[in-house]
């Protein structure tokens, strides 16, 4: 799960509020893209940081729908359910959105979920309320109703080389704020960007390329 130090976009293998660590690391917090970011892949992105250290950073975009596929269709493609069996899925599975998690490893699924579900040697506990699992076992569990209470599925992730995220933050490319369950797992993905900004006292309508960083 941990980043391996390649630049964003390169292929690699790799809640309660979480304040920045004493070393300034932001894992467990949300990044909010600023207009000066200049990278269309991250425009108006809200990213939950799963890992951040001297080795780099890794996160999941939580507000950009994948658009081309829904969760029941993905389960069919993986052979977890047969065609037409979506009517038997639990309500939270049938309506679960598939998100575009970032430009790295876009063919791989990453599930951010509440900490009531855990697979030994497969689940990364990020903080007391949020975990990350990237195996098909969690998809099977969600499909049969034994999965976590809250979850989102993202295809791909965002990754940063050592020091890259810090440089982008210093250049006003990102703001950051406390994460909460609604901003991570909420269904209103189109509203998350504005809500994250308002959480740190910024009116989205007043945001400009000259905005400073918090």
From Swiss-Prot:
A Pfam match = DUF179
Cellular component, GO, one term? cytosol
Using the record, list the residue span of the signal peptide; answer none if the entry has no such feature: none
Q: Provide the residue span(s) of the region labelled Disordered.
A: 1-22
Domain of life of the organism encoding this protein: Bacteria
Could you say which protein family the record assigns here?
A: Belongs to the UPF0301 (AlgH) family.
Q: What is this protein called?
A: UPF0301 protein blr1492
- This chain's source organism reads Bradyrhizobium diazoefficiens (strain JCM 10833 / BCRC 13528 / IAM 13628 / NBRC 14792 / USDA 110)
